[in-house]
């Protein structure tokens, strides 16, 4: 739809949120509200998007980047004034239309946007609005219709409405399409002769109606589609609905979610068929999970790729790649930058960071592997530590294929362990050591036994404590 410019209004503070963060940047299902709006507009086929920013505009610009163009509303003087700030970015010489949307209505999806635009074009209307009937419309403006025909007659802001008009339940959702030609001239005719002293965008269709031009209002089938969170209660409602929609989409695509009410999956997550998600699992960011996996329970995965046939149980995976057939957990932690090839096993209380792990590696218990490369088939014994940090710099550990690292081994980086080498349990080796392939490394201190010394040593400790305490 190259002949349509979308103008998204995102300049307001959102004071009812009672937050230091601008309302449109509050997250829903892992994505700021304005992100949902931009994505919905793009999925509807619109490429030319202008976002009107003001309060905390730097946050919005940082998030959206160059995906959109920007207009600035320095002073908050109403919705009509906000759209006017974008007028200079709308080319009226080529005809077409302008879509206006508030930046906080995430459930106006691409299908609804397409439906409104199609109805607008087919009717050759000057303006087309999307409306909804709410059980409790509160202080929102009301839509006025002819009681006999249902024809759209206009709208009235709540503060300007009569008691009878306030009983109307139909409201404008903040979404409208206008004919592009002459749109700026209409905006320049707006005035502030109302209770709030603001430039109302709805005055545009009042002007059009006075001129005898066609303005239509399309009513949404569901009140829930009009949900635009204004406070934390409504934000929680929106979050619950969006997550329910996300979970249902995955289930219809062949994913088993044992308890959808206790599973939290972000909007941009992809999951393959026949994967099973157990309760209390959180999957965030742009995570991709392959088919035939078992995820959870009590697992968190953030912006990672988990390939086919993996098991991730009671563990945390952050910004990492987990190859086919890997087993993670329970209680393992993959910190950012890990790459696991196929069939690796990372077990209880193991922690990895920036670790490249070869195929078939086993690291089952209480180990830390940081800034390390572990070759295929290596075995990492319980309690193995790569000491990679000296307080100033990080150093790498290289462990060759088929190497065997015994329990409670400290590898002081930088260190290289050759293919097939064996390091005996309890050894502390390195730094700057290169262990040859197939070598055996045993690091031991000779045990010293002093019979009867324990009692005298304990007595000395007691005396020292008494002297220190002055008793």
UniProtKB/Swiss-Prot annotation:
Residues 1-232 are annotated as: Pyrophosphorylase. Pathway: Nucleotide-sugar biosynthesis; UDP-N-acetyl-alpha-D-glucosamine biosynthesis; N-acetyl-alpha-D-glucosamine 1-phosphate from alpha-D-glucosamine 6-phosphate (route II): step 2/2; Nucleotide-sugar biosynthesis; UDP-N-acetyl-alpha-D-glucosamine biosynthesis; UDP-N-acetyl-alpha-D-glucosamine from N-acetyl-alpha-D-glucosamine 1-phosphate: step 1/1; Bacterial outer membrane biogenesis; LPS lipid A biosynthesis. Its main location: cytoplasm. Catalyzes the last two sequential reactions in the de novo biosynthetic pathway for UDP-N-acetylglucosamine (UDP-GlcNAc). The C-terminal domain catalyzes the transfer of acetyl group from acetyl coenzyme A to glucosamine-1-phosphate (GlcN-1-P) to produce N-acetylglucosamine-1-phosphate (GlcNAc-1-P), which is converted into UDP-GlcNAc by the transfer of uridine 5-monophosphate (from uridine 5-triphosphate), a reaction catalyzed by the N-terminal domain. The active site is at residue 365. Its EC number is 2.7.7.23, 2.3.1.157. The lineage of its organism: Bacteria, Bacillati, Bacillota, Clostridia, Eubacteriales. GO terms for biological process: cell morphogenesis; cell wall organization; lipid A biosynthetic process; peptidoglycan biosynthetic process; regulation of cell shape; UDP-N-acetylglucosamine biosynthetic process. SUPFAM superfamilies: Nucleotide-diphospho-sugar transferases (SSF53448), Trimeric LpxA-like enzymes (SSF51161). This is Bifunctional protein GlmU. InterPro entries: Bifunctional_GlmU, GlmU-like, GlmU_C_LbH, Hexapep, Hexapep_transf_CS, MobA-like_NTP_Trfase, Nucleotide-diphossugar_trans, Trimer_LpxA-like_sf. UDP-N-acetyl-alpha-D-glucosamine binds at residues 9-12, 23, 73, 78-79, 102-104, 141, 157, 230, 335, 353, 368, 379. Binds 1 Mg(2+) ion per subunit. It catalyses: alpha-D-glucosamine 1-phosphate + acetyl-CoA = N-acetyl-alpha-D-glucosamine 1-phosphate + CoA + H(+); N-acetyl-alpha-D-glucosamine 1-phosphate + UTP + H(+) = UDP-N-acetyl-alpha-D-glucosamine + diphosphate. In the N-terminal section; belongs to the N-acetylglucosamine-1-phosphate uridyltransferase family. Keywords: Acyltransferase, Cell shape, Cell wall biogenesis/degradation, Cytoplasm, Magnesium, Metal-binding, Multifunctional enzyme, Nucleotidyltransferase, Peptidoglycan synthesis, Repeat, Transferase. It holds the Pfam family NTP_transf_3. Homotrimer. It is an enzyme of class 2 (transferase). One of its GO terms (molecular function) is glucosamine-1-phosphate N-acetyltransferase activity. Acetyl-CoA binds at residues 382, 388-389, 425, 444. The gene is glmU. It is found in: Cytoplasm.
